[in-house]
Amino acid sequence: MNKKTFNFLFVLFFTQFYAQTEIKINLASALILTPNIGIEVQLSEKFGYQLDTSATFFDNVEGSPFQTTQIFNEFRFYPKLKKTKNQRSFFIGPHVGYGMFTLRLPKFITTIVDTELKDEGSYQSGRNAYYGITLGKKIPLKNKNFNLELFIGGGTSQSNYKYYNKEGNRIYENPDVKKKFNQSGEELIYRGGLMLTYKI
């Protein structure tokens, strides 16, 4: 392959890549000062891959830190396309995610659940993994480069974490059994919002 042919194929590939790529920002999470941004690459007419991340950076919520980061890999399927515009609409997609957190459970939970986090300033810090499904719908706007995307996702969240008091000392569920990590698993809705998307 000569240099001219290689350069032509290189430019053609990246032209197609960028023509089928969307960047996104979650308008709903932005309202609560939690940035959530993503990028979606069209793999074929009905399939796409999305990578998105979100984070919070609050040092003091009810006397405790509230810091989280999440990243999700998602494979999307668009079962139906609008015939006139070949416009993607409803989608469903399995996802796998990873997160880190340092936070306190809300007071309304600690008042009804038996937990070591009742003391002011106490918090938990750890890692979690997500396995689930996302459902959503793209809503076209007048400007063809922009769309709105309504979505919600949930599944299972598996966590490994430690409890700490406000001085930063470890709290154990059972002082006689000092585990390296506490573990928990829940089935819940853990992502969603309204994305503003832009086609590059």
List each language-model region with its residue ranges:
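Transmembrane beta-barrel strands of outer-membrane/channel proteins
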Residues: 25-29, 41, 51-55, 92-100, ...
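Extracellular/periplasm-exposed beta-strand and loop segments of Gram-negative cell-envelope proteins
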Residues: 26, 53-71, 101-129, 158-170, ...
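Membrane-embedded beta-strands of outer-membrane beta-barrel proteins
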Residues: 37, 73, 92, 133-135, ...
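Mid-chain, structured segments of secreted extracytoplasmic proteins
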Residues: 64-108
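Outer-membrane beta-barrel "beta-signal"
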Residues: 72-77, 186-200
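Short glycine/proline- and aromatic-enriched beta-strand/turn motifs that initiate or cap beta-hairpins
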Residues: 19-73, 197-199
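Short loop/turn motifs that connect adjacent beta-strands in outer-membrane beta-barrel proteins
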Residues: 46, 80-89, 140-148
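Bacterial Sec-dependent N-terminal signal peptides
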Residues: 1-22, 196-200
